[in-house]
Amino acid sequence: MRWITRSHVHVDRVACPWLITRFVDSDAEFLFVPASQIEKVAADTGAIPFDAPGVELGHHENRCSFESIILKYGLKEPGLLRLAKIVHAADIAEDIDTDPIARGLEAIASGYSLRYPNDLENLDAQFEVYDALYAWCRLDVAKNKA
């Protein structure tokens, strides 16, 4: 399937494609366009919009888009839910200090945006970061259960 969001990816617009690819649609194709073109391009291509104003898989009821995707697709793995807390805090400015990892993730996202201005290249580079962070989240959850 095709998925569409705003260009110039940052925390949520990198985390969401990672989540979609790893847990929802392993053959996902991502399109990045200016916010003003999302509705038209989504209609023309059949792409599913995310992390854009007014879309189902966006910010709603104090959720970031990553959390909206988790909710929509019924994802419940504890490590993934731990990662969602980090992504939320890193993406929502007023919540940045609600998780000790958030400022680091936001800084990493900023650095990758400087190194990789092309959105697809940025995703390719950052997916490894999210794979590693997810592995850590699974370990963190396991340690805190004991």
PLM regions with names:
Residues 1-8, 18, 22-146:
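Extended, well-folded catalytic/binding cores that form a central cleft or groove in large enzyme
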